[in-house]
Amino acid sequence: MISVNDFKTGLTIEVDNGIWQVMEFQHVKPGKGAAFVRSKLRNLRTGAIQEKTFRAGEKVAKAHIENRRMQYLYASGDTHTFMDNETYEQLELQTAQIEYELKFLKENMEVHVISYESETLGVEVPNTVILEVVETEPGIKGDTASGGTKPATLETGLTVQVPFFVNQGDKLVIDTRSASYVSRA
């Protein structure tokens, strides 16, 4: 059991018969009444996001998540195959389980596969990935003064807003948490 006062971003807990990951939390001490913790939780099974309020000092069960390093091998229809780097055991996941992460997955990429009590919940990609621009409008000289952006389609199919100086074929650093451009690689 863990106290809600000890919440940290990324902590996994068991609440209401579900496995939840703490995305955000805030300790609130109103002038009148008892303190409480307002939190934003993501269900690791369904991906649903829920806001929940706990009384300060309330105890919740900590979920012990197994985190295995695996390599993304290939996609075949709606099935995506991963391989454990130590045992060479292969694992297949459905598109619905890793829909968001697919925007960042390239073949042979190292990822963390998370599971709870032998049930695979999903995939955790690195915070940043390097992806190549496959389609974008050419930058026109003089456009940079405004500091604007233009859409660019990356090799995984993800479309992000990038500065005007980015061209087709450039490799970019992309933040996987916000699906946004960070810098050139």
Swiss-Prot record:
Pfam families: EFP (PF01132), EFP_N (PF08207), Elong-fact-P_C (PF09285). CDD domains: S1_EF-P_repeat_1, S1_EF-P_repeat_2. SMART domains: EFP, Elong-fact-P_C. One of its GO terms (cellular component) is cytoplasm. Pathway: Protein biosynthesis; polypeptide chain elongation. GO terms for molecular function: translation elongation factor activity. Belongs to the elongation factor P family. This is Elongation factor P. It comes from Shouchella clausii (strain KSM-K16) (Alkalihalobacillus clausii).
